A protein has these predicted regions:
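Acidic, proline/glycine-enriched N-terminal capping motif
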Residues: 1-184
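Conserved phosphate/oxyanion-binding catalytic-loop motifs
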Residues: 183-194
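Conserved small/polar residues in nucleotide/adenosyl-binding loops
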Residues: 195-199
Length: 199
């Protein structure tokens, strides 16, 4: 499959931003440890957001019916613990905001919900598509405390960034990079040079 880089994620996001904002998360499924299906509805339209965090196949997309059949995704009789946690906090909630982190393969979906004491709570579902470090993380936006994640990361795996419930969420370390707009502009300029006839 094509390399799912930050530009691909940004293009996918820009194309679907109008659907994301205000969409209600109706159903959450986790067929395997690394496959997720989020059934959403907005403006009378239903879609299924597919998230794959396999190290060699990480990507996200809205599934067409034919593609859903080809993937042969079967919901287990007993859902994983993380799936049940996501259902507890997010099923029935609407996406209040969404964004892609600049120059990263990270998609964030924000939710405004209510806790057990009927207090407003702002949550973030963070989808990190970064090869062997790919993960899905749910955290509280007010405190940045992680509620749960698809894969816990302990100190033995990462000295810089541990990921598990109860710890503070921090973004992965970033390397110096060029903004999306500059990359796109540079590619356009290269194309112009290649196809400009000599005078």
């Amino acid at each position: 499959m094509l390399n799912f880089d930050c530009l691909t994620l940004k293009a996918f996001f820009d194309e679907n931003i109008d659907f994301f904002i205000g969409a209600r998360l109706q159903k959450i499924q986790q067929p395997t440890r690394r496959d997720f299906v989020f059934s959403m509805r907005n403006n009378g339209e239903s879609r299924k957001l597919y998230i794959n965090i396999y190290p060699q196949m990480y990507h996200t997309c809205f599934m067409a019916v034919v593609n859903e059949e080809k993937r042969s995704l079967k919901t287990p009789k007993h859902p994983p613990m993380f799936c049940m946690l996501l259902r507890k906090y997010l099923e029935g909630c609407r996406i209040s905001d969404a964004r892609v982190i600049e120059n990263e393969r990270i998609l964030e979906l924000h939710f405004e919900t209510m806790d057990e004491l009927s207090q407003e709570r702002s949550l973030c579902l963070c989808i990190e598509l970064m090869g062997k470090h790919s993960n899905v993380i749910l955290y509280d936006r007010t405190t940045s405390i992680i509620i749960g994640c698809a894969h816990n990361v302990g100190s033995e795996k990462s000295r810089y960034r541990e990921l598990q419930g109860g710890l503070k969420y921090i973004y992965p370390p970033t390397a110096p990079s060029i903004p999306h707009e500059s990359l796109i502009s540079n590619e356009h300029n290269k194309s112009c040079l290649l196809y400009t006839s000599p005078s």
